[in-house]
């Protein structure tokens, strides 16, 4: 049965789009970004209104992901010239794929805008396909690591109290957490670091919001520990912006070479990488820190593991020191924009599937912090305009 949308609802959305489009060129980046968000949300809602429920469900299949996974794995977008075109037989030979198989995969990908066929059996780039090499770390993580986990969610739910902590462990036939599993596979850790740097460059998770979410300038000469800081991209940004800060980046030993390469020569006196597990007490070097930054760390862990991480920090903090937790705060259904809620709920599902963890509401965060021994309390919470993350400053309760 086809659902007929209300013409007034469709017109309201069309009017919103018409009103927002001129603002896309606004001199204010924030106003332009808000207008862009309005257009995306209105278009998404309009599509949902005019698409029948059956059509909507059919669109949610994994076929698009299958072709995209092949394109990313074989680096096809890096072989197709940026301008002009390439015969599909030559492309297939360079990628090591049968011509007929490649033709079918690419023609399916063309239905969602990736590549074009300007002449029979000749492949050319589109704006979409040109982005694939840049986004490869994200695609590799989502399609090669997360996708197999997603399709095992049902198996995990059938034995949710069993030996596996999440669907990821079933998919990859391991009892290890993702982090333990990846630590034995340097290519996974390296790609994950690139993935994190990619998703925090632009958009609602941009690293610039770290600079706005806390009064760093008021610290004066201070030491900041970027706990679980990957290859140092956040710590480097802090040190560049605030010359009085010294930054210690802590993470897996496998990231040390990448971090050392990333740190500019002129910052090496103020930014250092220190191999460290955040489940263990801080080293003598880090115990003198004024701020311990936990950015996108705790949502990867269940409550018990979060308590262990926070407890190790709380026990190491000098008097007056702070923990700064940068995380998404889940809002009640309908409180955020439609598009923002989609992203929040998708991330929450990913945490469940990949880590056996979750995104948390403010009340969840508050209860978690208070359950640490010694208890931690939120003394400030800032969400910069445009940021998906809130910055919660914690102190040991007096």
UniProtKB/Swiss-Prot annotation:
GO terms of biological process kind: methylation; polyketide biosynthetic process
Enzyme class label: transferase
Residues binding S-adenosyl-L-methionine: 251
Name of the encoding gene: aoiO
Record's keyword annotation contains Metal-binding: no
Transferase found in the keyword field: yes
Cross-referenced InterPro entries: COMT-like, O_MeTrfase_dom, SAM-dependent_MTases_sf, WH-like_DNA-bd_sf, WH_DNA-bd_sf
CDD domains per record: AdoMet_MTases
PANTHER family found in the cross-reference section: O-METHYLTRANSFERASE ASQN-RELATED, PUTATIVE (AFU_ORTHOLOGUE AFUA_4G14580)-RELATED
Protein name: O-methyltransferase aoiO
Lineage: Eukaryota, Fungi, Dikarya, Ascomycota, Pezizomycotina
One function term, GO molecular function aspect: O-methyltransferase activity
Family recorded in the similarity comment: Belongs to the class I-like SAM-binding methyltransferase superfamily. Cation-independent O-methyltransferase family.
Enzyme Commission number(s) from the entry: 2.1.1.-
Residues at the catalytic site: 299
Keyword terms: Methyltransferase, S-adenosyl-L-methionine, Transferase
Protein role: O-methyltransferase; part of the gene cluster that mediates the biosynthesis of a methylated derivative of known natural products orthosporin and diaporthin. Seems not to be involved in the biosynthesis of the identified final product of the pathway and its function has still to be determined.
Induction cue: Expression not regulated by the cluster-specific transcription factor aoiH.
């Amino acid at each position: 049965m086809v659902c007929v949308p209300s013409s007034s609802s469709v017109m309201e959305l069309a009017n919103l789009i018409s009103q927002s489009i001129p603002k896309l060129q606004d001199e204010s980046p924030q106003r332009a970004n808000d207008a862009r968000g309005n257009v995306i949300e209105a278009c998404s809602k309009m599509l949902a209104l005019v698409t029948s429920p059956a059509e909507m469900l059919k669109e949610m299949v994994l076929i698009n992901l299958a072709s995209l996974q092949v394109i990313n794995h074989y680096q096809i977008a890096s072989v197709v010239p940026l301008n002009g075109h390439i015969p599909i037989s030559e492309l297939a030979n360079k990628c090591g794929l049968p011509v007929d198989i490649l033709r079918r995969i690419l023609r399916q990908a063309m239905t969602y805008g990736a590549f074009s066929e300007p002449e029979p059996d000749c492949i050319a780039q589109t704006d979409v396909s040109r982005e694939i090499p840049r986004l490869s770390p994200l695609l590799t993580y989502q399609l090669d690591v997360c996708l197999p986990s997603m399709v095992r969610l049902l198996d995990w739910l059938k034995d949710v109290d069993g030996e596996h902590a999440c669907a990821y462990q079933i998919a990859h036939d391991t009892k290890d957490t993702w982090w333990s599993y990846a630590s034995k596979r340097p290519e996974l850790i390296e790609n994950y670091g690139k993935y994190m740097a990619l998703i925090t460059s632009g958009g609602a998770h941009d690293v610039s919001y770290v600079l706005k979410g806390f009064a760093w300038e008021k610290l004066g000469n201070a030491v900041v520990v970027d706990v679980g800081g990957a290859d140092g991209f956040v710590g480097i940004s802090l040190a560049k912006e605030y010359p009085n800060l010294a930054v210690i980046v802590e993470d897996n030993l496998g990231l040390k070479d990448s971090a050392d390469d990333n740190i500019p020569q002129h910052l090496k006196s103020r930014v250092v990488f220190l191999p460290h597990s955040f489940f263990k007490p801080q080293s003598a070097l880090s115990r003198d820190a004024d701020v311990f930054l936990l950015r996108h760390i705790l949502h990867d862990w269940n409550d018990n593991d979060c308590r262990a991480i926070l407890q190790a920090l709380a026990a190491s903090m000098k008097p007056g020191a702070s923990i700064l937790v940068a995380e998404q705060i889940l809002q009640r259904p309908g409180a955020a924009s439609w598009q923002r809620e989609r992203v929040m709920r998708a991330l929450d599902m990913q945490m469940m599937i990949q880590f056996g963890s979750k995104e948390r509401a403010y009340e969840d965060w508050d209860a978690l912090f208070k359950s640490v021994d010694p208890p931690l309390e939120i003394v400030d919470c800032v969400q910069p305009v445009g940021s998906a993350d809130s910055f919660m400053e914690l102190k040991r309760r007096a």
